[in-house]
């Protein structure tokens, strides 16, 4: 291991440990982290950043999945929407890529508000995404329509990356649950089916690691 590799490793671990601070004693994040780092074999921030730099290409689409709907309010939690919109701007600025945010309809208003703060434009035309623009696609909550919409979206071209950030995922029985075990299947967008795309795309699932990967990938020389 040379000096550069050692520096990457150490900074990667530092970012991981920073993001895993647990002031309230929740504990779950560290359990998940232990499993994830066994899988990657390296700091999650480093793994994510290297994947972003390697796979995201100028002018190509990057799918960003976000928007966990919460009961009883039937609204999306805010951390995923805000951080994903910031990430979309990062994709534009760092790589010149075309971010496509696939979200439940409840997210659209917040994304538009964030876009004004960030100085980016919004479009709904997935075939024509101008520079400095985020494309919004509202994804179905109807399981019987998920495959049809997935194929329609992919007919416009494959993405170079699929990023899932604070987004729900179904269990082996096809159900979605929130953090306290309540079944939320009927209210969640079914976009996690895009994680099964059979193509040579980079698929990464992020939560707090989004911040780690974003900071690291800014270096661009890794």
Regions flagged by a language model, labelled:
Residues 98-106:
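Short internal beta-strands
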Residues 190-198, 203-222:
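A structural signal for small-residue-enriched, beta-sheet-centric alpha/beta enzyme cores
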Residues 77-96:
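Histidine-anchored nucleotide/phosphate-binding helix
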Residues 107-113, 214:
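Short, charged/polar "capping" segments at the starts of alpha-helices
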Residues 37-39, 61-62, 66-83:
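Short, glycine-rich nucleotide/cofactor-binding loops
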Residues 64-69, 164-168, 209:
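Short loop/turn segments at strand-loop or loop-helix junctions that form parts
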Residues 113-202:
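An acidic, phosphate/nucleotide-engaging active-site surface
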């Amino acid at each position: 291991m040379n000096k550069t590799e050692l520096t990457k490793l150490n900074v990667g671990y530092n970012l991981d440990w920073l993001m895993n601070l647990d002031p309230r004693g929740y504990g779950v994040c560290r359990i998940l982290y232990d499993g994830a780092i066994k899988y990657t074999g390296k700091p999650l921030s480093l793994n994510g950043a290297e994947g972003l730099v390697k796979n995201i290409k100028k002018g190509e689409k990057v799918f960003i999945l976000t928007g966990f709907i919460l009961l009883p309010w039937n609204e999306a939690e805010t951390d995923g929407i805000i951080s994903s919109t910031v990430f979309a701007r990062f994709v534009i600025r760092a790589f010149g890529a075309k971010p496509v945010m696939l979200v439940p309809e409840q997210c659209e208003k917040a994304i538009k508000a964030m876009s004004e703060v960030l100085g980016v434009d919004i479009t709904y035309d997935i075939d024509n995404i101008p520079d400095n623009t985020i494309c919004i696609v509202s994804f179905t909550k109807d399981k019987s329509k998920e495959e049809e919409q997935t194929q329609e979206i992919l007919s416009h071209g494959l993405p170079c990356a699929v990023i899932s950030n604070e987004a729900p995922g179904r269990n082996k029985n096809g159900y979605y649950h929130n953090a306290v075990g309540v079944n939320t299947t009927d209210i969640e967008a079914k976009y996690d089916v895009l994680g099964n795309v059979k193509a040579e795309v980079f698929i990464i699932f992020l939560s707090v690691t989004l911040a780690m990967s974003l900071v690291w990938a800014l270096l661009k020389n890794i």
